[in-house]
């Protein structure tokens, strides 16, 4: 009997390269909201599909935006 073929999942497309983003800025709230869950948590790398370096920059930008009150610390609430 032949082995069954194992399907490999397609690699995720990098959303930053698709949107042609070269620099991650804490003032770009529309971009940063794509990387935050509805609960206000920063989404994981495996969910968003960005590189390690980009994930660090995104996390730092989100934290800076929260500090200056551009983004909430928590989600929308109840």
UniProtKB/Swiss-Prot annotation:
Name of the featured protein: Small ribosomal subunit protein bS18
Alphabetized PROSITE patterns for the sequence: RIBOSOMAL_S18
GO molecular function: small ribosomal subunit rRNA binding; structural constituent of ribosome
Gene this protein is translated from: rpsR
Organism: Kocuria rhizophila (strain ATCC 9341 / DSM 348 / NBRC 103217 / DC2201)
Entries under Gene3D superfamilies matching the protein: Ribosomal protein S18
GO biological process, one term: translation
Primary role: Binds as a heterodimer with protein bS6 to the central domain of the 16S rRNA, where it helps stabilize the platform of the 30S subunit.
Annotated Pfam families: Ribosomal_S18
Subunit: Part of the 30S ribosomal subunit. Forms a tight heterodimer with protein bS6.
Gene Ontology cellular-component annotations: cytosolic small ribosomal subunit
Family label: Belongs to the bacterial ribosomal protein bS18 family.
Record keywords, A-Z: Ribonucleoprotein, Ribosomal protein, RNA-binding, rRNA-binding
InterPro entries: Ribosomal_bS18, Ribosomal_bS18_CS, Ribosomal_bS18_sf
